[in-house]
Amino acid sequence: RQGIGGSDVGAIMGANPYCSITKCYKEKVGDIPPPELNYAMEWGSILEDVVGKKYAEDNNIHYHGGSLVEETPDYPVSKSGVMYEPSTKRNSKNDWAYAHPDFYVENKEKNITGIEIKTVGEGIYNKYWALGDIPPWQYYQIVWYSMVTKINKWVLVGFAPHLRSRTNPMFTHDIEIDVDTQLRVWDRVAYFWDCVQRRVLPEIDEPSGDDIKLLYPESTAEVVPSNSDIDSKCLKLKEVRDKIKPLEEEEEVLKNKIKYYMGNCGI
């Protein structure tokens, strides 16, 4: 709650399917507790070191154990660089903006590349990684890290355990962040943090059902005045429902005909 980190930014940008901007806001102002540690989060954290060591080994990089390193560790001259877990970084002008990347890699030319490691489930792999895409909430996390750390070159390392029996389960995305994207993200996140400080709900373009439940958990059954915009939306909703109903009826008829044909072979 003491600022904005990389894992918050996907929600703030409306790109995180697991956390909306409304939920993130409610967590930041203390209205709801932060998410509890689950098995996916626990094992994702455990596997960071394992995958990090493998990435370093594959790229002739010295892996430095230990966490929250303040200065670049020494490493053997036979290696092309050193990989280590940096301490938490904060923006020099805005202390609320912080980043805790998984690793840095510094090469012999003193150039630093940020490394972020993700354990990838089968669903996310099929939807994004298998197509060469980056999950958008993870991309925004990297964008945020690039702004806070002033490092523009990043490698997103994915590890998909379900692939390990038939192929290399580790794969990478090389990312360089452009200034326009950084500015767009910064403006949105700064606006969100200002809302948190003032305890004013950020503007929501398309509230979800979960957002409504968070904001209005109980119905007071009070009457609220309408307006032309809401009247228009109500008419549109009626039109949509009128179109859906005959399609649902047709769907049911077709399903039953197919099941009837299949007989006992059907489900």
Regions found by a protein language model. Name each.
Residues 1-267:
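Accessory terminal regions of nucleic-acid processing enzymes
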